[in-house]
């Protein structure tokens, strides 16, 4: 029987002298989450976030839980507005080694990303160890990023605020989260623009993960463990001006000015660590 994991939102101070109120505690049981069945996320609580009405505010803030005794991240909680969004370029986050960080390449791509709980485009956090967990590429790009983009686009288009909370859920003392609970509700329009509550699975199709340690292996057709593939480079096209990277076949590459194009062969993880972000069109 899995343990009931309280979403204890006792939020630590991120910046010295900055005060933040803890959000009400919410309990959520991983046993209530259906087993992964091929989709990156599942809707929770009829897509309604667990926020209390008293939490909705137009005052922007961001708070990140202190690491626990195992070095694991807890809840990240914010009221996202334009005033929190980054004004500068994304910086390297390679200095952070989140719990369970045992990274291996499969098919030329690293299994894990340093996943922002609250995406860089929302609050501009770079190498904040309280906001980075060990997460698969699949969870990061297919599961979390579409919801982050939804919130970012809404805030930029309306100048409204969005109450936003991401909670990693762990089974027992596992170092790698089984997934993350993502909640969001737009403030000024009373959830008309943004309203979701989803659980995103921390899985990678075709790869087995030992969540206790972060170790991984390739799964064969019959489920047998295969040896890890030899690391190999992948071809990308970089735009140093926008800090985006693309697949060579991406339509955006054709429109790129020659002086803004750099051909690159290497790992996706290295690009993310250097502050590049994937193109939203080709999703490399």
Briefly describe each language-model feature range.
Residues 50-227:
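Domain-level detector of nuclease and nuclease-like folds
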Residues 24-66, 234-236:
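N-terminal module-boundary/linker segments of secreted carbohydrate-active enzymes
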Residues 13-17:
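C-terminal motif of bacterial Sec signal peptides marking the signal peptidase cleavage site
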Residues 12, 130-133, 276:
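Residues immediately within or flanking Cys/His clusters that coordinate Zn2+
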Residues 2-10:
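Sec-dependent signal peptide recognition
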Residues 39, 46-47, 108, 173, ...:
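Intrinsic-disorder/low-complexity loop/linker signature
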Residues 222-284:
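Mature, structured domains enriched in cysteine- and short glycine motifs
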Residues 19-22:
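Bacterial signal peptide processing site
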């Amino acid at each position: 029987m899995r343990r009931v994991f309280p979403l204890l939102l006792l939020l630590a101070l991120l910046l010295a002298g900055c005060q933040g109120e803890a959000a009400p505690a919410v309990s959520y049981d991983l046993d209530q989450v259906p087993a992964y069945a091929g989709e990156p996320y599942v809707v929770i609580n009829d897509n309604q976030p667990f926020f209390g009405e008293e939490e909705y505010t137009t005052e922007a803030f961001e708070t990140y839980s202190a690491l626990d005794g195992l070095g694991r991240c807890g809840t990240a909680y914010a009221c996202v507005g334009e005033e929190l969004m980054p004004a500068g370029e994304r910086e390297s986050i390679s200095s952070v080694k989140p719990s369970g960080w045992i990274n291996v390449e499969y098919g030329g791509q690293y299994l894990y990303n340093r996943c922002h709980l609250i995406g860089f485009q929302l609050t501009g956090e770079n190498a904040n160890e309280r906001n980075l967990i060990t997460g698969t590429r699949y969870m990061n790009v297919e599961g979390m990023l579409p919801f982050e983009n939804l919130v970012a686009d809404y805030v930029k288009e309306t100048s409204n605020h969005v109450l936003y909370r991401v909670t990693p859920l762990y089974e027992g003392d596992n170092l790698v989260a089984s997934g993350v609970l993502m909640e969001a509700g737009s403030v000024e329009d009373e959830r008309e623009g943004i309203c979701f509550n989803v659980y995103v699975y921390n899985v990678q199709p075709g790869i087995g993960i030992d969540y206790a340690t972060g170790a991984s292996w390739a799964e064969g057709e019959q489920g047998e463990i295969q040896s890890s593939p030899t690391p190999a480079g992948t071809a990308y096209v970089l735009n140093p001006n926008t800090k985006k990277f693309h697949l060579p076949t991406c339509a955006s590459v054709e429109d790129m000015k020659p002086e803004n194009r750099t051909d690159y062969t290497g790992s996706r993880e290295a690009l993310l660590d250097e502050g590049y972000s994937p193109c939203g069109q080709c999703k490399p």
